[in-house]
Amino acid sequence: FQTGISKMYLARPAKIDDGILKLSGDEFNSKSVFFDEKKSTLKLKKFVPASGAASRMFKFLNEFLNDFDHENETINAYINRKKDKNLPTFLAGIEKFPFFEEIKSKVKSLVPNYYSLESHEKSYHFIKTMLSSDYFDFANKPKGVLDFHKYQSHIATPVEEHLNECAFYATSNSVSHLHFT
């Protein structure tokens, strides 16, 4: 194990009739009924591959913080200068993120003149606080523990969602098995 496991090289992608079987509606229903009838005799397990740290997910935001000239340019100027396509999408939906209110609240407590800032300055401080190791450190946390879905009653992480999925479709005889890598 000192050298790890050797890489696997794939010959080609799986496609329908070459590694993937396409079922008709009737075949699908038949196999689904068969599975439901037999699942109490099986030990079902939901397999969840590791997603790792969120560093790749927030890479474009780290690049923004490293390259953005906060004192001399607006975010729009940065977007145009870098031809960044991810940042505008992120900013357009920023208020929909389940973690938005918590981070915004922290930014308000950190930035004394928050209410007098222009929108792009608020966005800069939001991103900086979200990624800062002193506060939320999102880029260095496992994706599985980040706030993921916002429900009326609570905010769920991916780990919680996997547990719910496991209970829903990978349960046999009132027992669920879950394997996280």
Place the predicted regions along the sequence by residue.
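Domain-scale recognition of functional cores that engage charged ligands
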Residues: 10-57, 62-181
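Polybasic, low-complexity association/targeting segments
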Residues: 1-9
